A protein has these predicted regions:
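Noncatalytic, solvent-exposed loop/strand surfaces
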Residues: 1-239
Length: 239
């Protein structure tokens, strides 16, 4: 057992359960006004780190030794954490959303499998997937895009299912029962129908506080933590 953490320009660390440092790896020395935000992702024998801010690089480290197994560069304006998406009848894909493009990589080799035109602005929300489709939000223009997994090459015209002008700048969505839910930083609750991106509701929440946390579902409730006015609880249904 181990704990992996990313500290931006201070690098990535691996500690045992007693807090002893096992290894540390550098990921770059770049900084930005918002600081660093991406978390490490562990899958199989590798630890993935989106170091777009520190070095415009996506790294894959051996989780036992910290050795850099592979990396890909030119990752731009991406504060998001990658996700490992399960593909029906196919191998898993490592999904990373960045400014202008959504990428899928082979998690083991780092080979770029496909790419799709994305949000034309910086990206913060984490992609979510369900039943072979990945949903990517981001940008100050608040966009949302759905892409079918499993493609190869440029899939913009073949696998991009829909794009919506209802999205999120900072917060990540949650998928539940055919719908996507999230709360925007301006305290707006949002619900999209996942099948076609149709807006189901967009309503102001009962708080004046800003919201930068991602929504959490537990059972039939959605929990939204505000910046300074507690937690707002919503029903996990499209109304």
């Amino acid at each position: 057992e181990a704990v992996y953490a990313s500290f931006g320009v201070s690098g990535v660390v691996d500690c045992d359960m007693d807090g002893n440092l096992l290894w540390q790896a550098a990921i770059g020395d770049g900084t930005a006004g918002f600081g660093s935000a991406a978390s490490p992702v562990v899958y199989g024998d590798l630890v993935y780190v989106n170091a777009s801010i520190e070095s415009n690089t996506l790294f894959a480290f051996d989780k036992q030794s910290g050795r850099n197994v592979w990396k890909t560069e030119s990752i731009m304006k991406s504060w998001t954490t990658p996700c490992i998406a399960e593909v029906p009848d196919g191998p898993p894909e490592l999904i990373l959303n960045q400014k202008n493009e959504i990428f899928a990589f082979d998690p083991v080799t780092g080979k770029k499998l496909w790419w799709c035109a994305g949000v034309e602005d910086y990206i913060v929300p984490v992609p979510v997937f369900h039943d072979g489709i990945v949903y990517c939000l981001g940008g100050r223009s608040n966009r949302a895009i759905a892409v079918k997994l499993g493609g190869r090459g440029d899939v913009t015209k073949t696998h991009k299912l829909w794009e919506s002008t209802t999205g999120a700048n900072v917060t990540s969505p949650v998928y539940h029962d055919g719908h996507l839910y999230w709360a925007s930083d301006k305290a707006i609750g949002n619900c999209l129908r996942a099948s076609d991106g149709e807006e189901v509701y967009r309503e102001r929440l009962p708080t004046r506080s800003r919201i930068y946390s991602s929504i959490v579902r537990a059972g039939n409730k959605l929990y939204v933590t505000t910046r300074d006015q507690g937690i707002v609880v919503l029903a996990a249904k499209p109304e």
